[in-house]
Structures are given as C-alpha cells and as structure tokens.
Regions:
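N-terminal segment of the canonical double-stranded RNA-binding domain
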Residues: 1-14, 19, 23, 38
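A short, exposed loop/beta-hairpin motif centered on an aromatic-Gly-Thr core
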Residues: 24-35
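A short N-terminal helical cap/helix-turn-helix that marks the beginning
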Residues: 38-51
C-alpha cells in the first residue's frame, strides 16, 4: 500500500527533508530530491518491517 510523503526543501541549508504522516516518527533527509525520496522509501520499509 502506498504511503503519502511530504517532501520539503530548505534553501538555508540546501537540503531536502521528508516525512510520512501516516507513520509517526518516520522521516528522512538528503542532499537531492531523488536521494531524499529513496531515503524515505527505505525508512518506510524499515518502519513497517519493525512494526
């Protein structure tokens, strides 16, 4: 089942962050949008694996 993610860019630190609102505490970050998307997908997988 796909999960919604919220992706944000912070120009002050030149980094992206992502959270999954459906999974409390599931968050990640990265230098590029692509890296951040990959990181949050891995975080979601790990979150569900340990739930």
């Amino acid at each position: 089942m796909p999960h919604q993610i919220v992706l944000e860019y912070d120009p002050e630190i030149d980094r992206y962050s992502a959270v999954c609102p459906d999974l409390p505490g599931c968050a990640s970050a990265g230098v590029t949008e692509a890296e951040t998307r990959l990181n949050i997908e891995q975080a979601i997988h790990l979150f569900l694996e340990t739930a």
